[in-house]
Amino acid sequence: ASYTHLMHGIQHFVYNYSSADHLSFGAAVARVSPIERLIPLIVCGVIGGVGWVLIHRYGKGVVDIKTAVSGKMDMNPITTVLHATLQIITVGIGSPLGREVAPREASAGITTFLVKHFDIKQEDRQLLIACAAGAGLAAVYNSPLSAAIFTLETLLLTWNIRAMSAALICCGLATFVTRQAGVGDVIQYTMAQPSLGSHYVEFSIALGAIVALG
């Protein structure tokens, strides 16, 4: 929620609009002049370039989430949070970087730091770090189920009951807290609902059975 509010605040400041205008980010950018789009991108490049050079030169090393979950290397909380915050700042200005990586990194980095101070088995540490990353994804996109699936399929590589329960609880709680923090429950991407006839359902059932048996 903090990162979402930070990103929106930067967008509003840079492109001179507010939540009261009820504009999407794309619409807000489209209404400013070309020079007012160019200058923020130049500033974004400078901030991003200098920031990432400083992080990689003076930081403790950026460790990706999968490596942290595997237990091969620990994420440094300060370096990770700075790296994630820099991503959000550049995204707010107009960088094409995705905004979902930063909350996942920050959540996993902070959790890595916390679990080191408790007597927790390696297996439990991996589960907590993965669930923290999934919770970050759930919060930023308001999608607890998709985030739980991401946690299980991409990070934990397992579908056992224990992992499923932990992922669903963490992602669900993250989404609930984010909604209460004022981010709202707006669906990020809306899709037209297709009209499906009964033959599509029959085909899907048959195809699912064939794939499962194969």
Residue ranges and their predicted role:
Residues A1-G214:
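Alpha-helical transmembrane segments and immediately membrane-proximal extracytoplasmic
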